[in-house]
Amino acid sequence: MQDFNWKPIEPLSDKEREIDLAATNALYETWWDARKRLEESSSENLTAFIGRLVRRLSVETGILERLYDLDRGTTEALITRGFIEELVARTNTDIEPSRLIDILRDQESAIQLVMDCVAGNRDFTKGFMHDLHVMLTQHQNTTTAVDQHGNRREIALARGTFKEQPNNPRRPEGTIHEYCPPIHVESEIENLLNWLDDYKDEDPIVVATWFHHRFTQIHPYQDGNGRVARALTTLILMRANLLPLVIDRDMRAEYLDALESADLGELTPLATLFARLERAAILEALSVDADTDIDQAHKLTTAVIANLAAKFNRKREVHDTKLRKVNAVAKELRQQSRGDLEQSFSQLKDSLAVIYPSEVHIS
């Protein structure tokens, strides 16, 4: 295999614009409608779902970069309950649990910064990129450098500034992958951002894929470029009202192969991978919408039953009240009749006693 020589990035080509992502495109409007319903009827379910997706992204992006390893069970616990150190046993990861949680929280905070930009609270500029890089590498103090003789050594990591030295990795078979020389990074990033502004009417997944690849071609930072690239890809998708991009650890080889294909001029494998991941995220989100519909239907049914029960109870109360009134009147009449009868008997007894004093006994 030959060395890969750097060349300036290129705008989105006509060929790349025509990449067919129909299977995912068909879900866009369905998801946008569902999102609107969720925002109006069950915003807490939508927020919880996005939160889990962001935490999954935060875990997987570091695993892709070999910053740490983490077993699946602990991964799911952290995604469900949040980044809590007590959930991580020392045997479940290859670094100290406290350090793992620090890194995960950095990566989660970086995606929150992305969401601030999506909400319009930050502009998408070089300064924003630098802030994102600082946040993503907050607990990474060093990086591995290779000198001109091929010797590897740990050096201090420069955060929030573009690289000042080449960062061209040597592959296992000995070939060199050349990224953008430091002297051209500023102008290449400016081109990338300027072209991005022209693509607002293009398929957002194609644009996100193009941006992701061109950013990795530049490799503007000393280290952390993959994490920044994936965070910025999520930014582009979320600006189009789509969902964060989560590349799972099991897809690492496919992801890297797709990036190499893009280096050779074929963006389709990477776009297809991103579309597949976005489609899976949308379908999962639609299940949240369906669950919300079921929950709403259950709530409506419960409300109808409660309303009918209330009406029945009110009618029963009215009936019972009327019955109590009737019983009271009847009791009063009985008491009045008994009194009248007793008075009549008393009068009759007195009269008879006068006429037949010794023969009449009325008790």
PLM features: what roles do these ranges have?
Residues 1-223, 227-363:
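FIC/Doc superfamily catalytic core
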